Design a protein with these regions (language model features):
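Bacterial N-terminal signal peptides that target proteins for export
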Residues: 5-15
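Disordered, low-complexity tails and leader-like regions
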Residues: 1-7, 52, 194
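Acidic, polar-rich low-complexity tracts and alpha-helical solenoid repeat scaffolds
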Residues: 27-272
Length: 272
């Protein structure tokens, strides 16, 4: 009986090991199934991304708290604009968020094509599905966090390259493309590459901005116009951006700057 019991235990462990291997294989990034997409989206979101986003938020709050405002001139719309344009080396307080983004992409990216359905070439949705470059539905968040972390590290050139890649990588998702292009325009504005920033903003406006991105567009364009001292043109975009801004501190900053713009235009009745 002891021999039989030992054999049964071995068989049980073998079955468990087989199930674990089967589960791992079914959720491998080399397989593109509903199960593998769910598994890798879940793990990238609630494990790696969560830790990176927590670090990102803490670094951003610390940056905001540490910024000393100067009221002798027109204030900056965003404190990041006070950073030097010619930073000698990359890196900074947002490195951990970048590290976590890279880790999530490395471990959980699914680039394998899904099984093709009969007649897929004649179905626009199925054709677009097959043409995607990334099938983990959550990784777009990781890519965007990476670019934003580089941006807040004041590595604007590096961040602009990341956002440019995101726009190409997620060409099938117009909202992600618009968000990435708007961040890219912010990078160009911070580097004072105003022609490049204007080109992106103009093309977005011409091609049509997804409804979800309209408020972001207003904020980015308002900042661009103020940097170019086009104060009158900036006012309507400021009003839209202020209404949409959820962060109380940033909303107060934008209201104060709008008041300064009114004062600059001798509209003191609107300034206060």
């Amino acid at each position: 009986f002891k021999v039989l019991e030992g054999e049964m235990k071995k068989g049980f462990y073998y079955i468990i090991a087989l199930l674990i291997v089967s589960l791992f294989w079914s959720c491998s990034t080399k397989k593109n199934t509903k199960a593998s997409r769910f598994y890798h989206a879940f793990n990238s979101r609630y494990n790696i991304y969560f830790n990176g986003k927590t670090s990102f938020d803490e670094a951003l709050l610390s940056m905001q708290n540490g910024y000393k405002e100067s009221y002798s001139d027109m204030i900056l719309m965003y404190p990041i604009s006070a950073q030097p344009k010619d930073k000698p080396e990359t890196g900074g307080p947002f490195d951990r968020a970048i590290e976590k983004s890279n880790k999530a992409i490395k471990l959980h990216s699914i680039k394998a094509k899904p099984p093709k359905k009969p007649g897929w070439r004649n179905d626009p949705k199925q054709r677009a599905w097959q043409e995607q470059e990334e099938y983990n539905p959550f990784l777009k968040k990781c890519w965007l966090m990476m670019g934003q972390a580089q941006f807040y590290n004041a590595d604007f050139l590096q961040a602009s390259a990341t956002f440019s890649y995101i726009a190409r990588h997620y060409a099938h998702d117009e909202e992600v493309v618009a968000e990435a292009r708007l961040w890219q325009a912010r990078c160009y504005s911070e580097m004072e590459w105003f022609y490049e920033a204007e080109d992106i903003l103009g093309k977005l406006n011409t091609n049509g901005i997804p409804r979800k991105n309209l408020n972001q567009y207003a904020a980015v364009y308002a900042d661009y116009l103020v940097k170019n001292k086009q104060y009158e043109e900036a006012v309507p975009y400021f009003k839209t951006a202020i209404k949409a801004e959820k962060n109380r501190r940033q909303r107060t900053r934008m209201k104060y700057l709008l008041g300064q713009i009114y004062a600059e235009q001798d509209q003191n009745g609107l300034a206060y």
